[in-house]
């Protein structure tokens, strides 16, 4: 056990070496990206040893080695929880990040601030590992906020672009809403249970835990881009491609799902929270899959597919299968990072062209990248015996055999079928057919940094699912709950659907083009959500505040109440006064004339 804890800490310490080198200025600036990549590769190899020990023994460990603070009866100490989730996730995160770092050395080689970029990526990984290994809520919150601020810095890396700044701000603001939920949960646990340690919270297991769990669900909604707080995730594509790959594979977006998985001892008997996560996940996975169907930006399609997969993980938590959701996090990291890296390779080769309508015919021009892209797309759809199949098939089976909430599960099944549509669409538009890009574009994928990084993830996308699913406890084969013919039906329906799609495509490709339907507009404009939330709501707020400011302050207070009220009173007094002109001679004359006329009339009557 001593070796287990020591090597686990060495893994984390190895990652801090390049940052200390940068602080002490003991490095050659041109070699810094190589130092970072090497440190992560060594950390991955080191992390495999305690992971293998854990798989062999199944013994969890809590390392608590530095007491930090005591507030009355609350003890805060630096403690690491080396359990099933952290031990399985750490090697996956390190392996994927190692490949992304190598890819970044090729992709960002001309950037003048490449050393700072690598430092940011490394800090991003470290904060995620702090979040994963944290044993108390305070330490978890440090990692939680760490991935938030690093995502802001990395999405807005090209700060000269207005879109990048807007996207970075969006990411922060949407996550702030989620953080309110996290802080609410922390406050509730502190006031009611007087502890932030996870094992104590699980041991006390409060019966009325709806309030903190709603807070944690809100936090997961913000961080994992569930419906309502989802627009920041496709906008995050404004950052460099390595950032998109790291953000969407093994770091920030899975942090929210990971938080709910961490708290599964509280959620497993709470039907209310399970219903919330199930419905939220179902809406998210269907909505984002619909949005992905008509997008033309290659990175946006992959981003929406990430959001759809996060919704699927949320559904899995909702049907009380946290271990299955965690398995999907681990398998999803490999092919999602590879998909982003392949799209980055294509974008780089086509002079920053991201529109799939302007690609085509890349299968012969970039054979390796396109092979990896096809394998990644097939793994995403859950093609048998690729990595995605080992988790996705089990999720669909668990959903089909679940007795809860039929409409949510039906939405999930429709969304998973949409996955096949947008994955095939990328392959069809970007890789097949005639080239639709300018003839003078120089396509080159012969860089070892690019080839090796994608190759490593390609092997992961082919075999990681099998390796992970055969090594995680329990290793016994579960009993099949679904009839055999239903399992084979899925494969038959897939083949029939493919043949039918080809036939319909051949039949309709020469038909006259019609004006886009409402469903097409709904999908293309992302369900009108950004238009309403980012335009209409701020416009209404601004116009209301402007009217209230101008009406309440200017028209009412500064005009109606004080000056106008006083002026009206004074005007009445002044008109009363100015009615008398002060012409005494005229008054006397009029008085005299009146007397004379009256006397004359009196005398006349006599």
Curated annotation (Swiss-Prot):
GO molecular function: NADH dehydrogenase (ubiquinone) activity
Transmembrane segments: 4-24, 43-63, 87-107, 117-137, 140-160, 171-191, 213-233, 241-261, 272-292, 310-330, 366-386, 413-433, 457-477, 482-502, 582-602
Protein's UniProt name: NADH-ubiquinone oxidoreductase chain 5
Function: Core subunit of the mitochondrial membrane respiratory chain NADH dehydrogenase (Complex I) which catalyzes electron transfer from NADH through the respiratory chain, using ubiquinone as an electron acceptor. Essential for the catalytic activity and assembly of complex I.
Keyword Ubl conjugation: no
Family matches, as Pfam families: NADH5_C, Proton_antipo_M, Proton_antipo_N
Disulfide bond listed as a keyword: no
Catalysis: reaction(s): a ubiquinone + NADH + 5 H(+)(in) = a ubiquinol + NAD(+) + 4 H(+)(out)
Record GO cellular component, one term: mitochondrial inner membrane
Gene Ontology biological-process annotations: electron transport coupled proton transport; mitochondrial electron transport, NADH to ubiquinone; mitochondrial respiratory chain complex I assembly
Disulfide bridge positions per record: none
Major localization class: mitochondrion
EC nos: 7.1.1.2
UniProt KW keywords: Electron transport, Membrane, Mitochondrion, Mitochondrion inner membrane, NAD, Respiratory chain, Translocase, Transmembrane, Transmembrane helix, Transport, Ubiquinone
Locations listed in the record: Mitochondrion inner membrane
Organism field: Bos indicus
Topology within the bilayer: Multi-pass membrane protein
Enzyme class (EC, first level): translocase
Quaternary state and interactors: Core subunit of respiratory chain NADH dehydrogenase (Complex I) which is composed of 45 different subunits.
């Amino acid at each position: 056990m001593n070796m287990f804890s020591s090597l686990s800490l060495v893994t984390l310490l190895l990652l801090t070496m390049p940052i200390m080198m940068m602080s002490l200025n003991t490095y050659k600036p041109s070699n810094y990206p190589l130092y970072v990549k090497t440190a992560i590769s060594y950390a991955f190899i080191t992390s495999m040893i305690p992971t293998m020990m854990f798989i062999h023994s199944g013994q969890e460990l809590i390392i608590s080695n530095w007491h930090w603070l005591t507030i009355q009866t609350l003890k805060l100490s630096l403690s690491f929880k080396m359990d099933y989730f952290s031990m399985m996730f750490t090697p996956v995160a390190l392996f994927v990040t190692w490949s992304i770092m190598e890819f970044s050395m090729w992709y960002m080689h001309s950037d003048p601030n490449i050393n700072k970029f690598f430092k940011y990526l490394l800090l991003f990984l470290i904060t995620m590992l702090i979040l994963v290994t944290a044993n108390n809520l305070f330490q978890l919150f440090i990692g939680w906020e760490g991935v938030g601020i690093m995502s802001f810095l990395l999405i807005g890396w090209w700060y000269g672009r207005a879109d990048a700044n807007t996207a970075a701000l969006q990411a922060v603001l949407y996550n702030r809403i989620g953080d309110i939920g996290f802080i609410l949960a922390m406050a509730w646990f502190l006031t009611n249970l007087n502890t932030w340690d996870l094992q104590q919270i699980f041991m006390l297991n409060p019966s009325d835990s709806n309030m903190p769990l709603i807070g944690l669900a809100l936090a997961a909604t913000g961080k994992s881009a569930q419906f309502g707080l989802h627009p920041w995730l496709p906008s995050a594509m404004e950052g460099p491609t390595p950032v998109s790959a790291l953000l969407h594979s093994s770091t920030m977006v899975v942090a929210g799902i990971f938080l709910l998985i961490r708290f599964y001892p509280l959620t497993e008997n709470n039907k209310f929270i399970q219903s919330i996560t199930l419905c939220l996940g179902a809406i998210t996975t269907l909505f984002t899959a619909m949005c992905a169907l008509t997008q033309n930006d290659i990175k946006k399609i992959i981003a929406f597919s990430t959001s759809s997969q996060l919704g699927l993980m949320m559904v899995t938590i909702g049907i009380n299968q946290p271990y299955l959701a965690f398995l999907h996090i681990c398998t999803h990291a490999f092919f999602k990072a590879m998909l982003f890296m392949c799209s980055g390779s294509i974008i780089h080769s086509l002079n920053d062209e991201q529109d799939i309508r302007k690609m085509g015919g890349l299968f012969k021009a970039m054979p390796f990248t396109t092979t990896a892209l096809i394998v990644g797309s097939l793994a995403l759809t859950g093609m048998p015996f690729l990595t995605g199949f080992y988790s996705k098939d089990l999720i669909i089976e668990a959903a089909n055999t679940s007795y809860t909430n039929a409409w949510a599960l039906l939405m999930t099944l429709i969304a998973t079928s949409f996955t096949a549509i947008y994955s095939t669409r990328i392959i069809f538009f970007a890789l097949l057919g005639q080239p639709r890009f300018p003839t003078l574009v120089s396509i080159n994928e012969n860089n070892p940094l690019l080839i090796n990084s994608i190759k490593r993830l390609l092997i992961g996308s082919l075999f990681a699912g099998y390796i992970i699913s055969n090594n995680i406890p329990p290793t016994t084969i579960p009993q099949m709950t679904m009839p055999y013919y239903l399992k084979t039906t899925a494969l038959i329906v897939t083949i029939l659907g493919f043949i039918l799609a080809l036939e319909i495509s051949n039949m309709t490709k020469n038909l006259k083009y019609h004006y886009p339907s409402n469903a097409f507009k709904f999908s293309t404009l992302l369900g009108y959500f950004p238009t309403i939330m980012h335009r209409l709501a701020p416009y209404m707020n601004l116009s209301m505040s402007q009217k209230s400011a101008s009406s309440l302050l200017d028209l009412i207070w500064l005009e109606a109440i004080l000056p106008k009220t006083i002026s009206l009173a004074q005007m009445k007094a002044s008109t009363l006064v100015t009615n008398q002109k002060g012409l005494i001679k005229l008054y006397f004359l009029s008085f005299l004339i009146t007397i004379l006329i009256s006397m004359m009339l009196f005398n006349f009557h006599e």
